Amino acid sequence: MKNRKQNYFTKWNMFLLVMFLCVSVYGQKKFSSIIPGKEVKELIYKIVDADTLKMELYFPDNLKKNKKYPTIVFYYGGGWNGGTVDQFRDQAGYFASRGMVTVLVDYRVKSRHGSTPYESVKDAKSAIRYLKEHAKELHIDKKKMVASGGSAGGHLAAAVALLPGVNESTDDVSINTKVSALVLYNSVVDNGPGPGGFQHERMGEAYLTISPIHNIKKGAPPTMFILGDKDHLIPVSVADDYKARMDAVGSRCEVLIYEGQGHGFFNIRVDTDEYYMITTREVDKFLSSLGYIKGEPTL
């Protein structure tokens, strides 16, 4: 009886610890569930294993019928375990106001679908293929597509651009998933066995097929990498290594390190939107330098 009680209390204490960590890490963040004055278009992009996966799209004001627009696709973070499309809704609303089509992608995660990171990558790539296949009706300029995300979502963004494999068996692989730019927010990019590798054991022996940093080759798209120097999950050395590998193949990579900031600092918080504003302006300037938007940031 004593052992059963001890086991019960150990499990309860672990539950409380997990809940405390979730509140500590995520409780201060303030995700938006709507964008005032903006209509959202919800589409099913994939049905797999009885799971229906959707994406949400926002369009520029005064949308012109036959015009194609630069597009940015956001993948939320959550360690491939959870998360919500609300994470990047504020950024999506802002860049729609700057004249882009913006997309929030849902994908399979462990807590809801019992999936692995490999299924998450497959979904991320399926979403890009769907957008390219339906580019005309969705006003998407396929030559000006940006993938973006935070943490595990940033891993998915880098994956669609860099990984040649990890495709859904039902996908039309004649449609490539390459994008023309990446915006990575404290992103997982290294799944290798070294000190900077994230959850290497979880990836297994096939880690090279899913680790973006190990698949950087000539032609890798221009990238902005945003990171805090107090991030407890992604060391600054990983961003430096990513940039070094990008430099080696002749691709542009801007790394922005924010002093004293931890994981997820770029989101709006209950008490401040300072770093949301700062990082969004930097992304705006990066996209402007690529010719995707015009003028100075408007926030």
Where do the protein language model's features map onto the residues?
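Short amphipathic alpha-helix adjacent to the substrate-entry channel of hydrolases
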Residues: 85-104
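C-terminal catalytic histidine-bearing segment of alpha/beta-hydrolase fold enzymes
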Residues: 56, 240, 247-299
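Alpha/beta-hydrolase active-site loop
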Residues: 115-136, 278-282
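Primarily recognizes the serine-hydrolase "nucleophile elbow" in alpha/beta-hydrolase
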Residues: 126-198, 207-208, 212
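Short beta-strand/loop motif that positions the catalytic acidic residue
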Residues: 225-227, 231
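N-terminal cap/lid segment of alpha/beta-hydrolase-fold proteins
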Residues: 29-67
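Short beta-strand element of the alpha/beta-hydrolase
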Residues: 67-77
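Conserved alpha/beta-hydrolase "acid-adjacent" motif
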Residues: 232-238
